[in-house]
């Protein structure tokens, strides 16, 4: 099957395969067996056999008999000998040789009549090398483990982007890069956990369904609990519950889990995404930035063997060294050619925004500064950079800067020009936190869908005493983007599509 195969072609092939399935079932019932075996006498894997015999000479025998299974991805039948390439889930392949001498006429004809591309097949036989030097299994016994009713795509032709996303299983079957991305993601998450463990962090889990959405500025997904007869939200962030854990004495915690935001989807955004958040008692935004750099660099090392990663298009990107720390206001002033400070008024900022075509809904000082910074400065960022010291009115959970009035101790980490992570010196004063929540509620009343709600339960926890801490959040999908150079839909195994 090619990516553009017609529905009539597919229907015809499926009809033929259904007939073969019917025969399999009939033959199995006659023999008193199941057509789809529950288990198989597998003794090895394709990868293990290839590793054991990497340089077997042509036309050689080994005397080793193995039983293994794989998906048929190539097949060629001749009079007395049939060849099939079996592929394992890791992409490794081995040739199966089904010969008249070894299996007999009836079994050989049955192979020719029943086995199709895409079928899972078990074979047992001696490991040999063919006359052309191809590592092979000289089959003595075989069995169809599972019948494919749909034909495989052409392994030598690219799937369309749409097919790759909607039918990721076909992408995994046909493309090594897809399989490598899944492995890279697993390696990355394992590396993150190992780095946290080396710093005595404890992994915890917090609620996905919440009665009040908070911890980030974003629109939530809303649902309803029949059992409790109440409105619930899919979480936009785990922050407020993780901080409760810190109040309870869990001084270093992290969570890797799903977040949901009812917003746009593009090359760097997905409504459902994997998020890492961590909180470190007695730290600040400097110490948590150091930890974030270590997390990213360790993950790059685990995946690529180096801090210099190679992207899917062959580009090399250096995640090593010490990353720059760039003040937001100073960098904006330099790029815009106009001094912008925490004391700049909204009309002044609106005038600057209008002069360059930047539109901001519900203008506030912080929203204008951040949008202007994205217009003037963000396009020039490529190397990993911590953008430091944000406006106070867009960061309600962050403590005031220790020496600069009107800003908070917050950074955003940019890699390849997109935001990878964010970090704070966390606000721990419950009185100021209540004032910030009240201001957020006012913004919500003015139509800001992303404003946080006042969370009395969280404030009650804070009132029991919250230690000073640094906190950070990082998208796992975006971390894979930084390491692999792929878009976000490629880093998510099964992304949401229309």
Regions found by a protein language model. Give the residues of each.
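Class II aminoacyl-tRNA synthetase catalytic cores and aaRS-like
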Residues: 1-498
């Amino acid at each position: 099957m090619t990516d553009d195969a017609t529905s009539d072609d597919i229907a015809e092939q499926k009809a033929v395969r259904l007939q073969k399935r019917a025969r399999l079932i009939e033959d199995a019932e006659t023999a008193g067996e199941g057509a789809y075996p529950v288990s198989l006498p597998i003794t090895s894997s394709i990868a293990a056999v290839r590793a054991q015999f990497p340089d077997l000479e042509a036309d050689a025998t080994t005397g080793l008999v193995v039983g293994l299974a794989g998906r048929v991805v190539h097949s060629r039948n001749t009079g007395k000998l049939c060849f099939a390439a079996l592929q394992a889930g890791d992409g490794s392949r081995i040739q199966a040789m089904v010969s008249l001498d070894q299996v007999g006429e009836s079994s050989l004809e049955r192979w020719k009549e029943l086995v199709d591309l895409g079928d899972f097949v078990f074979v047992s036989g001696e490991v040999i090398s063919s006359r052309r030097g191809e590592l092979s299994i000289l089959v003595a016994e075989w069995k169809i483990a599972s019948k494919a009713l749909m034909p495989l795509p052409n392994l030598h032709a690219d799937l369309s982007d749409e097919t790759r996303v909607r039918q990721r299983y076909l992408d995994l079957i046909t493309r090594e890069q897809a399989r490598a991305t899944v492995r890279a993601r697993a390696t990355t998450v394992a590396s993150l956990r190992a780095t946290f463990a080396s710093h005595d962090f404890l992994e915890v889990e917090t609620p996905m369904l919440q009665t009040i959405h908070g911890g980030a500025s974003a629109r939530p997904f809303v649902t309803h609990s029949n059992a409790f007869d109440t409105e619930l939200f899919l979480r936009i962030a785990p922050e407020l519950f993780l901080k409760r854990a810190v109040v309870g004495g869990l001084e270093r915690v992290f969570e890797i889990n799903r977040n949901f935001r009812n917003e746009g989807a593009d090359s760097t955004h997905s409504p459902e995404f994997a998020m890492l958040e961590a909180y470190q008692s007695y730290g600040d935004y400097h110490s948590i930035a150091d930890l974030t750099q270590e997390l990213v660099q360790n993950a790059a090392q685990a995946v690529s063997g180096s801090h210099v990663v190679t992207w899917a298009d062959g580009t090399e990107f250096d995640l090593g060294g010490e990353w720059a720390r760039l003040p937001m206001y100073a960098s904006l002033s330099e790029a815009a050619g106009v001094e912008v400070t925490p004391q700049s008024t909204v009309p002044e900022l609106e005038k600057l925004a209008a002069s360059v075509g930047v539109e901001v809904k519900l203008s506030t000082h912080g929203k204008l500064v951040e949008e202007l910074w994205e217009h003037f400065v963000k396009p020039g960022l490529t190397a990993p950079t911590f953008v430091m010291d944000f406006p106070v009115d867009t960061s309600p959970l962050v403590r005031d800067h220790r020496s600069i009035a009107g800003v908070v101790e917050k950074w955003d980490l940019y890699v390849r020009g997109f935001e990878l992570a964010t970090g704070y010196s966390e606000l721990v004063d419950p009185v100021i936190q209540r004032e910030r929540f009240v201001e957020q509620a006012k913004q919500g009343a003015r139509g800001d869908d992303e404003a946080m709600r006042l969370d009395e339960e969280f404030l009650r926890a804070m009132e029991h005493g919250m230690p000073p801490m640094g906190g950070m959040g990082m998208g796992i999908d975006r971390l894979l983007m930084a390491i692999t150079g792929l878009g976000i839909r490629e880093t998510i195994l099964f992304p949401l599509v229309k």
